[in-house]
C-alpha cells in the first residue's frame, strides 16, 4: 500500500495506447483451468499478461452465464493501467461522455472559461446543465470559492468509563504536537490540521482532519491515522477498536459532513439579471425564489433530507465519473444547500454550497486514460502549483456545474417546462 499520491505528480504516459495483444489460446487454456479447479480466477495475472487474463475471465463468464461480452472486452487502453483500480477485470463499462459550456468561472483557483466534462446515461441532463451555463455566462459568470478543506478519519477507542474517556480527551489536547509528528511521519504531503474528540459512554472517537493537497487522500490519512493511534495506545490506557469509527463519515449520509464538512466545502453563486431570467429561462426571479424556498428548503426539511437542493447529485455524479473520482462519495458530495432570492434591483441571486466534496486530481481513478483526459479538459490534471490548487479548481468547477444544473431545473419548474423538456428530447 502506498501512503501518498504525489500532489506534484503528472502522468507522463499520455499515450495510453490500446490493449495489449491477447493470446487467445492461452486465454482459453486459463479459462479451462479455472473450470477444472486448477487455477483461481483472481490469480490469472500470475500466469498471463493482464489483457489475456481479462480475456480468460470473459470466456469463463460467457460460458457460465450465456452472456456475450464482446462490448465489455472492447476497451481502448492496456488492462495493466487499471490494475491499481480493480481486481478480476473482464473489461470496461463505457458511459457516454459529453461537455457543457464553456462556462465563465471566477474562482479562487480557477479563473477562466472552461468546458465541463460530464459522464452519464441520463438523457436531458447535459442539455439542462448547458442551459444553466449559458445563463451564467449572460450574467457575467459565476463566482466560486473553496471555503474549507480537510479530509477526515475518526478511529474509535474503548475506555473503561467516562472519566477515562475525558482523560483521553485531555491527553489529546495536551499532545497535539506529538500526534501531528506521528501522523506526518508516514507522508511527504499530508498535514494534520486538528483532532476533535467525541465521548459517547465508554467510547472515544477522535476525528483527525488533514490537508491532503491535490489527493482525495483517504489512503494517505488512513495510514497516517494508524500511526497516531499506535501512539495513543502506547501512552494512554485506551484501546483502539477500529481505525474507522463512522464519525469520519465516509460514503454514508451524515449530518457531521453537512455541518463540519469533509474534503472540500465549496460555494458557487451568480446574480442573474431579471431580463435574462425572463427572456432565457421564461420565468421570473420571484417564481424561482419561491420554488426554491418551498421545494428545496421546506420540502427537504419535511423529508428529513441532508440535501437542500434540486438535483446536485446529478452533475456531481457525472463529473465524478468523468474525472476518476470515487463514485461512492457522491453520497457526501450531494450534501448541498441551494439558495435563491430576489435582489433589491429585482434580479435573481442563486447559490449552491457543497459541504463535503471529496475529490482529487492525483491518485486513484484519475490515472486512468479517459479520466486523465477529462481532467485535461478542465486543465487540472496532476498536482497543482501551489499544491492543492488543482483539486481546489476541480471543486470550483463541480460547484459551478451544480449551480448551472440547479438554476436550469428551478427555471424549468417555474415555467412548467420540466416534463416537456424530457418529452422533446425523447427521454
Positions of predicted regions on the chain:
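Acidic/polar, glycine-rich intrinsically disordered N-terminal extensions of enzymes
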Residues: 1-114, 148
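Flexible, glycine/charged-enriched surface loops at secondary-structure junctions
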Residues: 70-72, 186-197, 235-246, 288-292, ...
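Hydrophobic alpha-helical scaffolding
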Residues: 75-76, 89-90, 169, 218, ...
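Conserved phosphate/anionic-ligand binding catalytic regions in large, soluble enzymes, centered on
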Residues: 91-127, 212-221, 300-324, 402-414
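Small-residue-rich
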Residues: 93, 98-199, 206
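A generic structural motif
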Residues: 122, 161-164, 210-216, 358
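Glycine-rich anion/phosphate-binding loop at the beta-strand->alpha-helix junction
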Residues: 214-367
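Internal helix-turn-beta structural module
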Residues: 349-427
Amino acid at each position: 500500500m502506498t501512503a501518498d499520491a504525489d500532489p506534484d505528480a503528472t502522468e507522463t504516459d499520455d499515450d495510453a495506447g490500446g490493449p495489449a495483444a491477447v493470446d487467445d489460446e492461452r486465454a482459453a487454456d486459463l479459462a479451462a483451468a479455472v473450470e477444472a479447479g486448477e487455477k483461481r480466477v483472481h490469480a490469472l495475472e500470475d500466469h498471463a499478461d493482464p489483457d489475456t487474463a481479462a480475456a480468460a475471465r470473459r470466456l469463463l463468464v460467457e460460458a457460465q452465464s450465456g452472456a456475450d461480452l464482446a462490448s465489455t472486452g472492447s476497451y481502448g487502453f492496456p488492462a495493466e493501467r487499471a490494475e491499481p483500480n480493480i481486481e478480476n477485470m473482464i473489461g470496461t463499462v463505457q458511459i457516454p461522455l459529453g461537455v457543457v459550456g464553456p462556462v465563465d468561472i471566477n474562482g479562487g483557483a480557477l479563473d477562466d472559461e472552461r468546458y465541463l466534462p460530464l459522464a452519464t446515461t441520463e438523457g436531458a441532463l447535459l442539455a439542462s446543465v448547458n442551459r444553466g451555463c449559458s445563463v451564467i455566462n449572460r450574467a457575467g459568470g459565476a463566482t466560486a470559492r473553496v471555503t474549507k478543506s480537510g479530509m477526515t478519519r475518526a478511529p474509535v477507542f474503548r475506555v473503561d468509563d467516562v472519566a477515562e474517556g475525558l482523560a483521553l480527551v485531555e491527553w489529546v489536547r495536551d499532545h497535539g504536537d506529538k500526534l501531528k509528528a506521528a501522523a506526518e511521519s508516514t507522508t511527504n504531503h499530508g498535514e494534520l490540521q486538528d483532532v476533535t474528540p467525541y465521548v459517547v459512554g465508554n467510547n472515544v472517537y477522535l476525528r483527525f482532519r488533514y490537508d491532503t493537497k491535490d489527493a482525495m487522500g483517504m489512503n494517505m490519512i488512513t495510514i497516517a491515522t494508524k500511526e497516531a493511534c499506535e501512539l495513543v495506545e502506547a501512552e494512554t490506557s485506551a484501546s483502539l477498536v477500529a481505525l474507522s469509527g463512522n464519525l469520519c463519515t465516509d460514503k454514508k449520509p451524515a449530518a457531521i459532513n453537512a455541518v463540519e464538512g469533509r474534503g472540500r466545502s465549496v460555494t458557487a453563486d451568480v446574480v442573474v439579471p431579471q431580463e435574462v431570467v425572463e427572456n432565457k429561462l421564461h420565468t421570473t426571479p420571484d417564481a424561482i425564489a419561491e420554488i426554491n424556498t418551498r421545494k428545496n428548503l421546506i420540502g427537504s426539511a419535511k423529508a428529513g433530507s441532508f440535501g437542500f437542493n434540486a438535483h446536485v447529485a446529478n452533475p456531481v455524479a457525472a463529473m465524478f465519473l468523468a474525472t476518476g473520482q470515487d463514485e461512492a462519495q457522491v453520497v457526501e458530495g450531494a450534501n448541498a444547500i441551494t439558495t435563491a432570492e430576489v435582489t433589491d434591483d429585482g434580479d435573481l441571486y442563486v447559490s449552491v454550497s457543497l459541504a463535503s466534496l471529496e475529490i482529487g486530481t492525483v491518485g486513484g481513478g484519475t490515472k486512468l486514460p479517459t479520466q486523465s483526459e477529462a481532467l485535461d479538459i478542465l486543465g487540472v490534471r496532476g498536482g497543482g502549483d501551489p499544491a492543492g490548487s488543482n483539486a481546489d479548481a476541480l471543486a470550483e468547477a463541480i460547484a459551478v456545474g451544480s449551480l448551472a444544473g440547479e438554476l436550469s431545473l428551478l427555471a424549468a419548474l417555474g415555467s412548467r417546462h420540466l416534463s416537456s423538456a424530457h418529452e422533446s428530447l425523447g427521454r
